[in-house]
């Protein structure tokens, strides 16, 4: 047979008909319900195996890219093939039931014989579809088919708005039984079908012990033509397409608009489907892997085969079921005859219908249905199974015939529970645990082996509210371990301590209320409070309520009084009765005892008076009694009443408590979720009471979340990536953190290893940044890690994409509830925002919102900000500041609020919304409050829609994907886009240049700077000029530049500071992820490299590392080709890796990466000495060639060549520094070659900036190596270049760069006076140029010079500016260096600018900061300075702690001032420790001293150390020598240090040297507590400024290094 081609008009009625069988579409039914019809036909039941397992595989998938859409594609690929076969053979698909379908061939009885043959042929062809195929998800799809024939009844039932139908009869039972007998790839005929078929045509085999038979194959007679046979059969099929419609699969495709028929058919289709019926992408739109609750209801009848008997019962049951579902927001998805009985598949949580307390609703609904249906006449047994979890909800089938259905293990489980546990309501463990209902509402059931269910877990019978309340069930419940600390809740506990103090010293009641959303840890706070509240004469009563408590009158007070009276521990009512009698005998007449019967479940005789009393009067009598009892107790004890989940306090209990706090002194502490509805008047009165303290609980702070993760994993340390993911994802909510952690453990992506010290770790690229977040030391000491050797660290398995991880079901469910409660327009905005990412701009959102105007978007955004879906921020700094700290807890003064006039409240709300709209307009950044909401909303998009949206975003962002106007709009990797063509938009570069010109920007190639000429002679610095004259000329030039910058009307300085960081965050980062989502890996790689380069510019090594790892994954996916663009990307990748390694001080790794990059850039660096000297010779000739102006004849390099040359200069600039670190003799030649290659490469670029940088590097290299003539020459050449520059734009920046670099060079060489002169000018330039990073560097270098030169007034002024920069720009380096200098002032200058405690607090607070942690120099200096402080105080335990931390950072060698400052401080600490060892006559003191002296000598000998550090190093060497008794060497080193200090102008060191020299050679001994006495008298800077302390007297506050005698010999 030929497969017909499908073509039809897509009217709405056709789309509705696609959800229904022909039996309904063409049926003519009476409007009365129930309605019965009878006919004959053949039934086919097809059961498809493998789909449930596939659903489970997708629902438990780690990543968001394996969603429902892929699943529905796979499902429908297979199911549509079956549907097509059925339709081709004339069948009518009656129902889809998950992964099964029921088809009907409706014909006259006399035609059954031939039609059965057709159906068998169809069945065999269906098997043929699946026989040899192994499907794409690795799942083997197979089918089982049962056939039956005979008399069939149809029942139509429903109400005015909804209709359902069932097929009933022996044939229906037979087809189900036949399918159950079938094995994979079998076709089973029911006994009746076998009787009615043409037996001569079928080869069968018998089924053991059954009358049914199995079909082997058809055996038609010779010359039998099946096509002709089938054509004859189609004449008996009333709705088989023929004639002009013969190419259609289904005649219903030809339906024309018919309002009456359409209205009739709509009743059979779910409302959520009808809402979307106009959406032509309906099939995918409603397809989700979604957490839902399944309620499977089975009704068994006394006589199932008689439709007229069971019809009315089904109608009655349906009417009640649908009314109850409407109340609880559930829907009937399917109704069908299931084995024995009629089954209703009800679902809670369909798309758009997710509500809170879904599980409770489902159970209550199930119980209601059970109770009602059990009473319906003709219904023999009611069985209900309830299961919760992720299932596939979506449209399954073929384009012309499909249905909305649910598939998944939980659907199967609910069905099996319903059949294996008849006559009761059962539920699974997920429903039991998630309902939060009391345990006594359930009873655990014995396990049964259920078909198709491997492991059901514990199953429960749901009783509902039929059991009596049991005492002792209301105690506080918390899963926290006893020794588990309460993290991050000090503020909340302080509120309690303060209120408790008020309660104890006053004679009035106090109420403390903690309000917080679920998951914030309210129960843990109460558990801690219960422990802290314990004391003499304190009576603590703690109870926990639940949803049911709210509906039980006086329940809270019942539990309270049961505890007060000691009844909660009584095991029998008689014991309770005796206790009660003893307690109330003096307070209550015996005839009133029976008042206590109902409330305390006792059995006192009922008196006549009480029997006549009204319920209200009984309640009042009880309250009077309870008040009397409490009045007696409070005289002897302080009552503290703790209530968890107080939102469930019933109104009667609220009234009693309100009266209680007015009458007696009692302390009530409650935790509660925000009230959904307005609370009762008594509750409001309690909240507004003058003695009520109402606290809204905030989130836990990031540091505490980090500690929680370590404690929960039982490790001492976690990776930064894991910490960031859990910290950001949890939003500081403990429950979210726990769920995310469980999700990671479930997917087995966490790896645990034994702790390894930093020194022993063999550093590779993959472990460069591991184990960065440690458990807070105090917690480490008091909790889980007593055995240091057994400490573990946790990191992630390689290749895990945390950004794409699908959220845990529990958190997804919370987000779906929020989404489904929104208006459709709000949902659409949230979903569009989710495509952009966690953070987005209003401009981009407006671009992708379909058909919205700006006013509408702003109004919707304001509403969503008010609803805590979004936060809004004015700029990136505001956002980053907010991300560092979660919203803390705060107190709400409801009493004050209630006293305000209520007039104009509505007006006030409108005004507030308008203000919010204005705020949104001003804000540049919007961010999801909860990352899980963004992920959940993102997953709701279809794949094609998602791609289209990502493409839209990418096109919009692409135009701005470059550096800011301040930085002249370049690439972060110079000339990157000229080398790699990654643009989506058709705009060519010429057009862009024209646009740039029209906006007043000069393109890069137009700048004068690009063509740099090498001056022919020293026009500016004639040879006869002295160094002093040259110095004067340089300083005057910088002064001239500064004057012009300050006074010129020209556009010399930028109007705003650098915005590159903003652009990186809101343009380039999202753009890379959009390309990644689009599968454009080459474009994504381009932007990941740009991002890594940008982060390196911003000194964020960790983030650069992370994005290079992202790039590495993409590099592996790209097809290997030899194109220059791909080679350049690889070279850039390795050069950036080299930069990261260099910045981290991993110089061996850096060298390897940089060499590899140079090789790819066609600039091979030699590996052996022969090649080395050959290269040196070649580079010398090249340099001679450039210097002699021969190179100027060649045209400027092209843009691609420039990109290559710029990369080479970066690599070579780092390489010469790396080789300079080495003590090996031949390495100086490698360093010389590298710096020469850098200079020649820079000259080839013909770019002034590159040439100047290279000259200054060449000068510094020779300066450090001691070649005076060479370094001076190239420094002068660099200066000659800047004299030629136009003083605007980049020219000004080059001048500032030269000034700053000269400051570094002069400082490191020890020319402090000149460094100060240059530094003050460089500082002013960078301040005017508004570049925070450069500004910071100039402040640091100048402050270091001023400190060494002891110019304290100027130093304090510079430190003030450094502090201002750190605060206004949120600049962590500035703050860290500020405190580093403050520690130096404390240790060496003799006064206090910031206290030691403040400096220490900064270290504790920021040592795990992402940027600071991976900047080894500053932390090394801070740790070492603190270690020195403790060594001077002889607090050796603290010394070891900080010294060891510093020691771990020593291997990270970087050629920075901070690193060498840090290492000199570290060595000083070790020298002080040596003094301790010698004093204590330690065995290894001699060896330690010798090793220390050797290390100090090596540091002095190393070129890169710089002469400025030599006075301190010689000073320390002198001290080591005097400690070891070598007076001669000590004198030599002292004199060298003094001479160098004098030459350099290092007054700080010179004074200290003289004082120590005098002390060492004097006969007087120093006091043991010398430093302690000194720090107690250290003056503050304020005292010095006020003139109360003479600045000259500060010298006496310097620490004197202790040495006993000069002739101390070992």
From Swiss-Prot:
PROSITE patterns, alphabetized: GUANYLATE_CYCLASE_2 (PS50125)
Family annotation (InterPro entries): A/G_cyclase, Adenylate_cyclase_typ10, Nucleotide_cyclase, P-loop_NTPase
Keywords: ATP-binding, cAMP biosynthesis, Cell membrane, Cell projection, Cytoplasm, Cytoskeleton, Lyase, Magnesium, Manganese, Membrane, Metal-binding, Mitochondrion, Nucleotide-binding, Nucleus, Repeat
Essential cofactor(s): Mg(2+); Mn(2+)
Tissues where this protein is expressed: Detected in airway epithelial cells and testis (at protein level). Weakly expressed in multiple tissues. Expressed in brain, heart, kidney, liver, lung, pancreas, peripheral blood leukocytes, placenta, skeletal muscle, stomach, thymus, airway epithelial cells, duodenum, jejunum and ileum. Very low level of expression in bone.
Regulation: Activated by manganese or magnesium ions. In the presence of magnesium ions, the enzyme is activated by bicarbonate. In the presence of manganese ions, the enzyme is inhibited by bicarbonate. In the absence of magnesium and bicarbonate, the enzyme is weakly activated by calcium. Calcium mildly increases the enzyme activity, also in the presence of magnesium ions.
Alphabetical GO biological process terms: cAMP biosynthetic process; epithelial cilium movement involved in extracellular fluid movement; glucose catabolic process; intracellular signal transduction; mitochondrial ATP transmembrane transport; negative regulation of cardiac muscle cell contraction; negative regulation of mitochondrial membrane potential; negative regulation of reactive oxygen species biosynthetic process
Topology in membrane: Peripheral membrane protein
Known catalytic reactions: ATP = 3',5'-cyclic AMP + diphosphate
Chain positions recorded as Mg(2+) 2 binding sites: 47-48, 99
GO cellular component: apical part of cell; astrocyte end-foot; basal part of cell; central region of growth cone; cilium; cytoplasm; cytoskeleton; cytosol
Binding sites annotated in the UniProt record for Mg(2+) 1: 47, 99
EC number: 4.6.1.1
GO-annotated molecular function: adenylate cyclase activity; ATP binding; ATPase binding; bicarbonate binding; magnesium ion binding; manganese ion binding
Cofactor note: Binds 2 magnesium ions per subunit. Is also active with manganese (in vitro).
Localisation: Cell membrane; Cytoplasm, Cytoskeleton; Cytoplasm, Perinuclear region; Nucleus
Binding site for hydrogencarbonate: 95, 167, 176, 337
Residue positions binding ATP: 47-52, 99, 144, 406, 412-416
Record PTM text: Cleavage may occur to generate the active 48 kDa form.
Record function comment: Catalyzes the formation of the signaling molecule cAMP. May function as sensor that mediates responses to changes in cellular bicarbonate and CO(2) levels. Has a critical role in mammalian spermatogenesis by producing the cAMP which regulates cAMP-responsive nuclear factors indispensable for sperm maturation in the epididymis. Induces capacitation, the maturational process that sperm undergo prior to fertilization. Involved in ciliary beat regulation.
Disease the record associates with this protein: Hypercalciuria absorptive 2: A common type of hypercalciuria, a condition characterized by excessive urinary calcium excretion. Absorptive hypercalciuria is due to gastrointestinal hyperabsorption of calcium and is a frequent cause of calcium oxalate nephrolithiasis.
Protein name: Adenylate cyclase type 10
Record organism: Homo sapiens
